[in-house]
Amino acid sequence: MPPLSESEFLALASKALDQLEAAIEAAADAADADVEINRTGNVMELEFEDGSKIIVNSQAPMQELWVAAKAGGFHFRNDGSKWVDTRGGGELYAALSGYMSQQAGVTLTLK
């Protein structure tokens, strides 16, 4: 996918974070898991019952979404249809489902 202008990327990232927030709420409700979601602009903080956190934020200069979790730090770039890990090639929702499940202690599946 060719580079986007900063405003195009910010719109794409904002939409992705909106969709991700809704998917996380649905997954937490379905699993009866306690996941607190706090969002300020381009930063989403997920806090779990044990006090651990996952941070998801957009990085306009790199045109990436960054995820910081207990499992490590990960960068995702949009390929035109989905957000893909720049190192491992995994898809954002699948990867984040795993990170969240690890930290929540229950299976959480983002759809």
Curated annotation (Swiss-Prot):
Pfam families assigned to the protein according to its UniProt record, in alphabetical order: Frataxin_Cyay (PF01491)
Signal peptide segment: none
Keyword vocabulary terms for this entry: Iron, Metal-binding
Domain of life: Bacteria
Recorded GO MF terms: ferric iron binding; ferrous iron binding
Record has Flavoprotein as a keyword: no
This protein's GO CC annotations: cytosol
Claim: Metal-binding is one of the keywords in the record: yes
Any Gene Ontology biological process: iron-sulfur cluster assembly
Classification via PANTHER family: FRATAXIN, FRATAXIN, MITOCHONDRIAL
Family: Belongs to the frataxin family.
NCBIfam families in the record: FeS_CyaY
Function: Involved in iron-sulfur (Fe-S) cluster assembly. May act as a regulator of Fe-S biogenesis.
Protein name per Swiss-Prot or TrEMBL: Iron-sulfur cluster assembly protein CyaY
Originating species: Cupriavidus metallidurans (strain ATCC 43123 / DSM 2839 / NBRC 102507 / CH34) (Ralstonia metallidurans)
